[in-house]
């Protein structure tokens, strides 16, 4: 079954997951979502496959989170998704998708859950 990793190549955890997949000989596709942005529909599908709500996927320590004053707002599911689509830095990473399941592979050891 095809595996897709949604990542930011400069992210340490993303590089760990990439290396682990390469070393295990697993066939996978890496998607840099800064170059190939996630659509709202795709992000919603990934959230559903992960069993997560959008606020759980927000990177709350990112500068943009504070700059936009998001720490002072009670955001809806749709608002969070829209923000992550517009500002990919707000997306926790890496996300690993395999068939009807996806995980947030943070820490990288979580990768075992999907292989």
Kindly give the residue locations of the regions a language model identified.
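Thiol/selenol-based redox catalytic cores and closely related redox-interacting motifs
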Residues: 35-115
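Local sequence-structure signature of Cys/Sec-based thiol-disulfide redox active-site neighborhoods
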Residues: 1-24, 28-33
């Amino acid at each position: 079954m095809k595996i897709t990793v949604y990542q930011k190549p400069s992210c340490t955890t993303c590089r760990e997951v990439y290396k682990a997949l390469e070393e295990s000989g697993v066939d996978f596709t890496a998607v840099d979502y800064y170059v190939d942005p996630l659509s709202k529909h795709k992000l919603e599908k990934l959230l559903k496959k992960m069993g997560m709500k959008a606020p759980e996927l927000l990177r709350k320590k990112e500068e943009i989170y504070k700059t936009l004053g998001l720490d002072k707002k009670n955001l809806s599911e749709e608002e969070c998704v829209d923000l992550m689509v517009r500002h990919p830095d707000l997306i926790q990473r890496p996300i690993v998708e395999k068939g009807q399941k996806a995980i947030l592979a943070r820490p990288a050891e979580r990768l075992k859950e999907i292989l």
